Structures are given as C-alpha cells and as structure tokens.
Amino acid sequence: TYEQMSLFEDTENKERQQTERQIFDEALELIAKDPNFEKKKVIVLAQENWHQGVIGIVASRLCDMYYKPCILISHTNGVGKGSGRSIKGFNLFDALTHCEKQLIDFGGHAVAAGLNVNMSDIDSFIKEINKYADEVLTEQDMIPTVDIDCPLSERSVTLENAKLLSKLEPFGMNNEKPVFALAHAQVMNIAPVGADNKHLSLRIVKNNQTINCIGFGMGEFAEFIHQ
C-alpha cells in the first residue's frame, strides 16, 4: 500500500541520514587526529567499509566546511573506492590524472570524481595529490568566495518567493542554485538544534524586521557564524 511504501521510504531515509552522520563524525575524528591537517590543501580520508552511497555527500559537506578539495575512501580487502568533491580553481579530474600512477582507475570532472586505489598506495597518493595542490593552488585560492546572483531586501525574504525558486529546478552543474545576499543585517541567536544538533537555527534582523531561519543539516556551521 501507499502507507507501507511511505513508511519504508521514511525509514530508509532516516537510516541513510544516520549513516551519513556517523561517517561525518568519523571523518571529523580522523581530521582531529592528523597533526598535519592544516598544512594539507587536499583532504583525503580512508576508512574500512564506509557506505559507498553516502561518502560523496559527506565529502561535499567537508569540502564546503573547510573549503578544501575532499576525497573520502571506503576500503575492503585492501582496495579502496573513493568519491571526491572540489573547490573553485582546483580541477579534480586533472589532479587525479596527475596521480594516475598511484591509482587503479578514476573518472569524473572538474568538481566531482570517483577513484579506485590499492590501499598499499594510499600514502603515496595523499603525498602526490597534495604536492600537486601546492603547485596549482595559491593561498588566495584557499579563501572561500561567494558569487552573488542578486541582492535582496528584507521584504523579499518570503516563503512565496522561496517556492517560486523551485520552478528553476533541477539544479546541478550547468544550473547552479541561485545565491542571494541580504546586506547590512544583524545575525543573532545562532544555535545548533534538533536531534544530534544537526540543524542550524538563527535570527536575522534588518530595519526592525526579524527573520527566523532554519538550516537543515547545517548544525556544524554554527561555530563558524559570528553575531
């Protein structure tokens, strides 16, 4: 029945979210244990039996969070399968091409790619891709930038306008999500909320108008936003 299908999909979605959160937390632990993390321009993390269907999503989150190219690798029986996401100015496919001697195979494009690697070659791969990144990425490239499509007034921030944006979907590489800016506003009451603090709550105030905001799955960004 429809109800059974809906319940199954809801359960499956919750399990995927739990798996994603677990991998994300484990990735953060690996980062915290790496004394050379700050020096590396490319994040490469490997763990046994990470879920293949989720590592790309987590790689994307880490890429946004640290503004570094990120590759997550799940390995079994000495062979790793990886999924990577990149930042502006760093062509991930070109980087993997440069490291092809350390890889079994790879594919993808400038901002997203997949790879297979023997775990016996993982250390040399990490060294080589970071060496390449040092050559092609400047310190300026590592500073996050945001391309604004349109400035907003506080009166334009409505649910009706948000729903209108859905008419532009589907978003993707050749149809990126539009980015709007509400300038000279005050950000207040920043806090992670929800189960496991995985969502973000904040309040924006401009010209005596208050806008309550929620960012789903964005709880980890709370510490990076300043009032």
Residue locations for each model-derived region?
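Internal, active-site/partner-interface "lid" segment
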Residues: 111-161
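Hydrophobic helix-and-loop "lid/oligomerization" segment in the mid-to-C-terminal part
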Residues: 1-120
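OB-fold single-stranded nucleic acid-binding module
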Residues: 121-127, 220-227
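Long, low-complexity segments enriched in small/aliphatic residues
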Residues: 153-205
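Beta-strand/loop nucleic-acid-binding surfaces
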Residues: 208-226
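Noncatalytic, beta-rich nucleic-acid-contacting surfaces in large DNA/RNA-processing enzymes
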Residues: 79-83, 188-191, 222-223
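Broad gene-expression machinery/nucleic-acid interaction feature
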Residues: 67, 79-81, 112-114, 143-147, ...
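Conserved, well-folded catalytic cores of nucleic-acid-processing
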Residues: 30, 34, 65-69, 102, ...
